[in-house]
Amino acid sequence: MNTIKRILAVIDPTKDDQHGLARSVELAKKSGATITAFMTVYDFSYEMTTMLSGDEREAMREAVLKDRELWLNDLVSPYNNLNIETLVVWHNRPYEAIIETVIDQNYDLVIKSTHQHGALKSVIFTPTDWHLVRKCPTPVLFVKEMAWPENGNILAAVNAVSENDQHIALNKRIIKDAQFLCELANAKLNLVNAYPATPINIAIEIPEFNPSLYNESVKKHHIESTNALATEFTLTNEQCFIEEG
């Protein structure tokens, strides 16, 4: 991703604040991208209306869509100085509707807000979020309610020791995409690589096994591999973080 021309901003009709839309606007101002404010709608009572005629069922569906379209148009009205359009789709599986739209209309980026657990103060990924992570063919950016800080940090997670060609290619794509976002957000890029802890069962089953020595050897291998990967992208060792986990 070295350019962003089209952004799909996923709207959550159950929320008053649309953080995904706000971040989309920020990126659009910096990249010149167009935005589509996207929302799925489905009324499950529609499935209970088998006694109605086909025309009556269609009229009911159109009424629901029209109501949501008016609401969405009102939501984006403060941004009329940007190239922003709206799209409401009737679908009972939001992630499928999002992915189909991304494929059909060639979007470069999907931006969606996350949900925060009130008691735990932590981010919760919904089933829709997980489906998008696994299946969406274009990058997905999940955002929280806080604004992006100026001169902030972007952390790119890599698997620096992998010898799998797909993983190696993914590492490079992650770093390149992160570099592009750093340019837009005026941020600093850092890499993080995790290495596995020493298996406890080995230490128990093999008395002469030295877990500390093994752990240091694994850590050293990951440090060297991460630093080498960073060098390919003119990043310093100080921008690399290698942690057990």
Segments predicted by a language model, with ranges:
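Structural beta-alpha unit
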Residues: 1-3, 23, 76-110, 117, ...
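Conserved beta-strand termini and adjacent loop/short-helix elements that scaffold enzyme active sites
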Residues: 38-40, 87-91, 143, 192-194, ...
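A conditional alpha-helix N-cap/helix-loop micro-motif detector
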Residues: 17, 65, 91-92, 122, ...
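Gly/Ser-rich helix-loop-strand patches that form or flank binding pockets
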Residues: 3-5, 99-150
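A short acidic, glycine-rich active-site loop
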Residues: 55-70, 210-221
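Small/aliphatic-rich secondary-structure junction motif
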Residues: 2-55, 153-208, 216, 231-232, ...
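Short acidic active-site motifs
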Residues: 94-98, 128, 225
